[in-house]
């Protein structure tokens, strides 16, 4: 299986979403614990339920604690998608409510993964130059990517409406969000 091979051999950053999370939920957990890759998992509540073997009600009742516990146990960064998205590496916890109902459409997870890949390729190097992150640059970068994605989605919904919104609408507004952050 390709994912098992990557977990055993890959040493870079790896975003796992959708079907990859289903595969991860069904494989030997020691592969996750022993990987040299920097895993970024981006589940929604049901996917996280399968990963953790906890009920969706348990996760909804304590999303921060559940995500933090899993991240600590497996040495991964978790981005738990929901009305308030939780991002944690087990130590640092970030929460963003950026996003909107129009983003609940096919392809939105792919857009998020693309934004995360771009931000996580660039931002940790910039963050490392600043003090105060103490090895948590990846979690900060994932949180920044989630925020950019959510704000771009909000702009897309504001301008296009939620009913007709498609995933690529979010992409159309990422540059505007990034530019506004650079000006801030």
Predicted regions and their residues:
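Glycine-rich phosphate/dinucleotide-binding loop and adjoining beta-alpha-beta core of small-molecule
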Residues: 1-97, 182-183
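Short, small-residue alpha-helix embedded
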Residues: 50, 105-130, 137-148
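Short, charged, surface-exposed loops that flank catalytic or proteolytic processing sites
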Residues: 54-62, 126-143, 161-165
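Charged C-terminal helix
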Residues: 150-184
